[in-house]
Amino acid sequence: MELYLDTANVAEVERLARIFPIAGVTTNPSIVAASKESIWDVLPRLQNAIGEEGTLFAQTMSRNAKGMVEEAKRLNNAIPGIVVKIPVTAEGLAAIKLLKKEGIVTLGTAVYSASQGLLAALAGAKYVAPYVNRVDAQGGDGIRMVQELQTLLEHHAPDSMVLAASFKTPRQALDCLLAGCQAITLPLDVAQQMLNTPAVESAIEKFEQDWKNAFGNLNL
């Protein structure tokens, strides 16, 4: 299983990388824009934060296949081994096919249906990123879509994997993992929610109080 953080906040990546067993960091144009940093400045800093073995994801901006391929090559030259995120449009599928031949690893992003995700995988994307909460927000069933996509990839594109994205709650992320997803990416607030469990703090405080009452200190 691969766990990623969905952010361009270098300080938070450094903080959470000490705690979470993260495989890397995913970004998108909105996330990079929110950081107020040039993508060419922030990507090296993110790579440094996750280490040489961490995987970094960044997205192209062009709307046509030729431009996507050119931008993907620029990203790959700047950060060798980066996974390039390509929106799964008609032009995006064409770009994924071309990049597969070039040996550049891709992720098919902005996936709102299982069929769309399958096409990305068949075109050559190593990762496919379904938008769980956004599907829910449009009246669909994000988890059901992920389940269908996971089954389709297992049967027809076993070299590709679901990297589920767009979460508002830890429960959504866990449901994707229960559906068989091999990778998820968490926004910072959802990652923090996984750490903040009031019942755990209450239990620890009770242990400490009992120990202190018995021994007068909190030392072993």
From Swiss-Prot:
Pfam families on file: TAL_FSA
Catalytic activity: beta-D-fructose 6-phosphate = dihydroxyacetone + D-glyceraldehyde 3-phosphate
GO biological process, one term: fructose metabolic process
Keywords tagged on the record: Carbohydrate metabolism, Cytoplasm, Lyase, Schiff base
Molecular function GO terms recorded: fructose 6-phosphate aldolase activity
Enzyme Commission designation: 4.1.2.-
One GO cellular component term: cytoplasm
Keyword set includes Lipoprotein: no
Enzyme class, broadest EC rank: lyase
Keyword Lyase: yes
Compartments where located: Cytoplasm
Catalytic residues, chain numbering: 85
CDD domains in the cross-refs: Transaldolase_FSA
SUPFAM superfamilies found in the cross-reference section: Aldolase
InterPro entries: Aldolase_TIM, F6P_aldolase, TAL/FSA, Transaldolase_3B/F6P_aldolase, Transaldolase_AS, TSA/FSA_arc/bac
NCBIfam families: fsa_talC_mipB (TIGR00875), PRK12653.1 (NF009296)
Family the UniProt entry places it in: Belongs to the transaldolase family. Type 3A subfamily.
Free-text function comment from the UniProt entry: Catalyzes the reversible formation of fructose 6-phosphate from dihydroxyacetone and D-glyceraldehyde 3-phosphate via an aldolization reaction.
Quaternary state and interactors: Homodecamer.
Name of the molecule in the record: Fructose-6-phosphate aldolase
